[in-house]
Every structure is written in C-alpha cells, then in structure tokens.
From Swiss-Prot:
It comes from Corynebacterium jeikeium (strain K411). Belongs to the PTH family. It catalyses: an N-acyl-L-alpha-aminoacyl-tRNA + H2O = an N-acyl-L-amino acid + a tRNA + H(+). The lineage of its organism: Bacteria, Bacillati, Actinomycetota, Actinomycetes, Mycobacteriales. This is Peptidyl-tRNA hydrolase 1. TRNA binds at Y27, F80, N82, N128. InterPro entries: Pept_tRNA_hydro, Pept_tRNA_hydro_CS, Pept_tRNA_hydro_sf. The gene is pth1.
Length: 193
C-alpha cells in the first residue's frame, strides 16, 4: 500500500470499463448480466471485432482496445457478482488506473426497463456488485453506468428475477439498451467530440 504522503502514479489516459455479471453459460442472458452484455457490444464495435482474453493475475477476462484514441481496458470479472470488487481493484492497480477513470456497467432494478444512466460517484442502490467494488477500491469516485431492468412482477423475489433470462420478446429492447450504454461510454471517452 502506498504511503499517504506519496501520490501513487496513475495512468490517467487509460480507462477501465467493467461489465458486471456472473460467469458461465447458465447466466449469460440473465438480467444480472446486462453489464457483461454492454462489454460485448463495445467489443463488437471494434474494427476488427475484439475478443476477451483471461488476465490470470486478476481472474478477469479483458481486451485492451482504443476508443476515441484512448487506451481502454474492457473487463468482465470471472468471479460472481457479489465479489467483483477484488478483480476490479486488482485491474485498476495493475494498469495504474485511477477510480475516476473506471466505468462500471450494471443491472439496475430501480431503473425503468431499457433506461441507461451514467453518473459519477454516489451510492450503490443496494447493488451487491457495486458494494463490493466500493469496498475494494476504498472510494465511491468511479462512474456507474446503470442499465434499467425494472422491478420484478408481483411478489417475485428480486434475487430470482435478476437471475432469470430475458424473454425472447425483450431481445430487441435489450439490444437497444446495450447499444445506448455503449454509446454513453463512447461519448464519455470523447467519441464525436
């Protein structure tokens, strides 16, 4: 750990974009994996399309890409959602990325279905993945990219709801939401400016 009197060297030109979710095919198309879907959209936009590779030191799948001329690390932790903080902190340390250059895409139960909102800093809104990241980074000063999935119907348990796959009838809406989220990342990094 760095001495409080010494400023840690950071690479402020590099950004870390993290897509939260759970690993494995069982969870691939669930509401809880929307963050991972956003990373997939960003990968597909690379020319040629980029792919993830395992970064063994951090137990994370990553791709190093350029967006708007900036070096960007796209990442999907290989851990379950609730313990995402460790890999995110390790990646930030490995690449020397400050918290203010980290964007975390996640599923938002409180957000209207399909709504995308980017905000810097703030609370975790009860999201265990964000809680883990805040605890591991020791700060709230990272960006949150919420992807609205809405509340569960009736009395359905929210934990069961987020682990259900999106129905085929919502596929187009999910694709649009992921595209909107990727657009928001690109705007933040300077695409179109």
């Amino acid at each position: 750990m760095a001495s409080p009197n010494k400023k840690q060297h950071t690479n402020s030109d590099t950004w870390l974009i993290v897509g939260l979710g759970n690993p494995g095919d069982k969870y691939a198309n669930t509401r809880h994996n929307v963050g991972r879907m956003v990373i997939g959209e960003l990968l597909d936009r690379q020319v040629p399309a980029a792919s993830l590779n395992t970064h063994k030191k951090t137990n994370t799948d990553i791709a190093e890409v350029k967006i708007a001329g900036r070096k960007v690390v796209l990442a999907q932790p290989r851990t379950f959602m609730n313990v995402s903080g460790g890999p995110v902190q390790q990646l930030a340390a490995f690449f020397k990325i400050p918290a203010e250059n980290i964007i975390v895409a996640y599923d938002d139960l409180e957000g209207d279905p399909g709504a995308v909102k980017l905000r810097q800093s703030g609370g975790d809104k009860g999201h265990n993945g964000l809680k883990s990241i805040t605890k591991s980074l020791g700060t709230k000063d990272y960006w949150r990219l919420s992807c609205g999935i809405g509340r569960p119907p009736g009395r359905m348990d929210p934990a069961a709801y987020v682990l259900k796959p999106f129905p085929k009838s919502e596929a187009a809406e999910v694709a649009i939401m992921c595209a909107d989220a990727a657009d928001e990342v690109e705007r933040t990094l300077g695409v179109g400016n």
